[in-house]
C-alpha cells in the first residue's frame, strides 16, 4: 500500500528494518525468538517508523499534489448533505463556523470522530477491554540487557511490549494498567511500574521519557461506513487493540479501497452504488478478520500462562519449531511481513490478503487492478 502511494522509499529511508522478535516472560526470560523476522531481504520487509514521522512524510507528499489542500486548526462541528453535494461545518482556529462543500465527505477523523457522531450519535458497536494500555517513548539501554528489536512479554498481570523505534535508541514501552485507574493515578504509579517491569529495575534518573499516553483498548465498528455522500474510514469507522498492527493497516486498506471507489465514480466507470459495496466489504472485513485476529493476538499476550504457552498455543509452538523445520521457516519468511502474523501458518496463505479488497473489479468496464 505504501509502495502504491509512492511513499515507501521515504519510509524506508527514515525508518529501519528490525532484526529479531522475542516472546518473553514478564521478567525478560526468553520463551521463543524469531530471528530476522522482517525478513530483511524481502522487498516487503517490515519497517519500523514512529507514526509522527510517517505523518510528516505523508504530509510532505500531499503538499506536492495540486489537488490536495491542508487546513490546520479545523474543528469539525457537523456534517450534512443533499442530493447533489455534502459538506462539513468547521470552526477554524476557534473562529466562527464555516461550511466546506464537496461532492463527498470522507470522515477519517479518528476514534472520537465527529463525522461518525454526526451520523450515528453515540452508537459505536462493540466492547472496551477492562485493561488500559500506557504507551511511552523512552530512552533506556535495553540492548545491554539482551533485548531484541521487538519483545512481547506475556503475563496476565504484567503483559507489555518493548520495541525499538529509532536508530538512535528510542524505544516504545507499552504496558498494562488497571482500567479503573484515573489519569492522575496512572502518572503517579508510572515510575513504580517501570521499576517493576524494565530490566535492571531502573529509577527515574536512569531513563528519559519523551512522552507517556494512557489509552483504552476497544473492539468497535460503526453501523455503516457509508451514508449517502458521507463515508467513514480507519479509526473513525472501526477500532481494535494494537496487537498485530491491524488498526493502522486496516486504515490504510480502507483509504485505498475508498479511493478506488471515488476514482471509479469520478472516471464514470462506477455509479454511487459502489460506495455501498465499500460499506459492505470493509465492515465484513472488520468483523470477520480484523476483530477476531486482533482479539486472538491480545488474548495470547494477556491471558496465557508463559510457563505452558509453548505446549498449549499452536502458533507459539510453530514459532518454536521454525529453528528445526526449514519448511516452516520458509513459509514464515514468505508471509510474515503482512499484518495477520499470528494466524496459524498452515492457513496463513489463504488469509494473507484478508484485510485488502480490490474495488476496481466493480467498475462497469475493465477487469480491475489489484490493490497492492
From Swiss-Prot:
Disruption phenotype: Impairs the production of terrein. Induction: Expression is induced by methionine. Nitrogen starvation induces expression of terC and promotes terrein production during fruit infection, via regulation by areA and atfA. Iron limitation acts as a third independent signal for terrein cluster induction via the iron response regulator hapX. Finally, expression is under the control of the terrein cluster-specific transcription factor terR. Pathway: Secondary metabolite biosynthesis. FAD binds at residues 76, 172-174, 215, 235. One of its GO terms (molecular function) is oxidoreductase activity, acting on paired donors, with incorporation or reduction of molecular oxygen, NAD(P)H as one donor, and incorporation of one atom of oxygen. The keyword Flavoprotein applies. Its cofactor is FAD. InterPro entries: FAD-bd, FAD/NAD-bd_sf, RIFMO-like. Its EC number is 1.-.-.-. FAD-dependent monooxygenase; part of the gene cluster that mediates the biosynthesis of terrein, a fungal metabolite with ecological, antimicrobial, antiproliferative, and antioxidative activities. The first step in the pathway is performed by the polyketide synthase terA that produces 4-hydroxy-6-methylpyranon (4-HMP), orsellinic acid (OA), and 2,3-dehydro-6-hydroxymellein (2,3-dehydro-6-HM) by condensing acetyl-CoA with two, three, or four malonyl-CoA units, respectively. 4-HMP and OA are not pathway intermediates, but are rather shunt or side products. Belongs to the PheA/TfdB FAD monooxygenase family. This is FAD-dependent monooxygenase terC. It comes from Aspergillus terreus (strain NIH 2624 / FGSC A1156). The lineage of its organism: Eukaryota, Fungi, Dikarya, Ascomycota, Pezizomycotina.
Amino acid at each position: 500500500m505504501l509502495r502504491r502511494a509512492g511513499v515507501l522509499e521515504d519510509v524506508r529511508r527514515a525508518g529501519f528494518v528490525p532484526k529479531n522478535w522475542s516472546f518473553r516472560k514478564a521478567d525478560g526470560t526468553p520463551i521463543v525468538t524469531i530471528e530476522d523476522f522482517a525478513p530483511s531481504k524481502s522487498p516487503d520487509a517490515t519497517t519500523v517508523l514512529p507514526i509522527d514521522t510517517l505523518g510528516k512524510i505523508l504530509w510532505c507528499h500531499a503538499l506536492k499534489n495540486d489537488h490536495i489542500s491542508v487546513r490546520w486548526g479545523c474543528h469539525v462541528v457537523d456534517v450534512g448533505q443533499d442530493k447533489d453535494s455534502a459538506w462539513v461545518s468547521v470552526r477554524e482556529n476557534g473562529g466562527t463556523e464555516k461550511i466546506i462543500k464537496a461532492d463527498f465527505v470522507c470522515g477519517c477523523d479518528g476514534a472520537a470522530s465527529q463525522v461518525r457522531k454526526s451520523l450515528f450519535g453515540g452508537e459505536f458497536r462493540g466492547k472496551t477491554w477492562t485493561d488500559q494500555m500506557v504507551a511511552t517513548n523512552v530512552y533506556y539501554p535495553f540492548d545491554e540487557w539482551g533485548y531484541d528489536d521487538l519483545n512481547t512479554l506475556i503475563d496476565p498481570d504484567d503483559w507489555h511490549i518493548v520495541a525499538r523505534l529509532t536508530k538512535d535508541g528510542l524505544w516504545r514501552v507499552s504496558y498494562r494498567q488497571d482500567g479503573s485507574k484515573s489519569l492522575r493515578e496512572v502518572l503517579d504509579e508510572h515510575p513504580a511500574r517501570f521499576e517493576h517491569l524494565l530490566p535492571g529495575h531502573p529509577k527515574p534518573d536512569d531513563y528519559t521519557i519523551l512522552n507517556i499516553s494512557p489509552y483504552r483498548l476497544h473492539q468497535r465498528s460503526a453501523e455503516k461506513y457509508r451514508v449517502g455522500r458521507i463515508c467513514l474510514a480507519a479509526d473513525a469507522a472501526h477500532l481494535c487493540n494494537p496487537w498485530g498492527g491491524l488498526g493502522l493497516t486496516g486504515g490504510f486498506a480502507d483509504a485505498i479501497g475508498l479511493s478506488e471507489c471515488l476514482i471509479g465514480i469520478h472516471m464514470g466507470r462506477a455509479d454511487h452504488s459502489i460506495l455501498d459495496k465499500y460499506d459492505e466489504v470493509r465492515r465484513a472485513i472488520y468483523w470477520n478478520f480484523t476483530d477476531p485476529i486482533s482479539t486472538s493476538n491480545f488474548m495470547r499476550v494477556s491471558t496465557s500462562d508463559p510457563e505452558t504457552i509453548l505446549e498449549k498455543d499452536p502458533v507459539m509452538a510453530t514459532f518454536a519449531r521454525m529453528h528445526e523445520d526449514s519448511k516452516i521457516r520458509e513459509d514464515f519468511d514468505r508471509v510474515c511481513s503482512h499484518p495477520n502474523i499470528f494466524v496459524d501458518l498452515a492457513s496463513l496463505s489463504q488469509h494473507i490478503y484478508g484485510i485488502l479488497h480490490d474495488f476496481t473489479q466493480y467498475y462497469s468496464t475493465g477487469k480491475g487492478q489489484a490493490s497492492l
